């Protein structure tokens, strides 16, 4: 029988805060954990060896919480997730980490974050290359439903999102990459991934068939095809979101990458190309490299397709 081991209100004192002043002293923190695990053997044997020792889980979490300073609750939560997946045979973890007495006068209770992740999703985060940091940072905005991954390559984003329960359609001109992506999805039993080899850069009057109001979200990472933007926006459902990141001209000027200047966005150009969307997030500047290496100059955008206003009768 599948089930969960639940640990509520595990409290400890740790150093977590954006400012050095907040980190200078410990503060009360708490975490709730839900650990998914197959409980059949333990139920039949009544033997601790066949289950997860929640006392050891609690001890490990407290050790990590007390022994490491963190600027953000998010980084502390990642430390917990990494250790628990590495050291205990859990299938999925859901946690709620919070400051019990945050230094915000208007907050009378707690402030915190929740994270839910499967073992497969954790493994995919460690692939090379891993999912883009920008996608991970904006994951809380990603609406549930159907996603289109444009220029998907070997599927670092598609496989990750499918492991979280998303239905992901992928397109890429590289037939070998698409074949590898399809094979990787089958090997991981990810039935929510579909693949299509498609050249999006054919000359006019070619119009790519990406659908009409089909997707809840569209991802484009490190691929720039300016004539494609109207088709991307058309393919979004009203209320759907575009997640976009690629190089700016500063990266070409500083690093000569990409080699061709036309493959880079000019300053503010991404906002012009997505003017019909409502901007939920935009940042242009130096960001961590998409392979986790040295920083690169990119523009990052999350844009929402508005619902059409109803006309008055």
Model region roles, listed by residue range:
Residues 174-176:
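Conserved SAM/SAH-binding beta-strand->alpha-helix loop
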Residues 285-313:
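Core SAM-dependent methyltransferase catalytic element
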Residues 189-202:
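Conserved SAM-binding strand-loop segment of SAM-dependent methyltransferases
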Residues 1-127, 137, 150:
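N-terminal, polar/charged subdomain of small-to-medium soluble alpha/beta proteins
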Residues 206-217:
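A short acidic, Gly/Pro-enriched loop at the edge of an enzyme's catalytic core
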Residues 167-172:
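Conserved SAM-binding motif I beta-strand of class I
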Residues 144-153:
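Conserved class I S-adenosyl-L-methionine
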Residues 240-251:
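Conserved beta-strand signature within the Rossmann-like core of class I S-adenosyl-L-methionine
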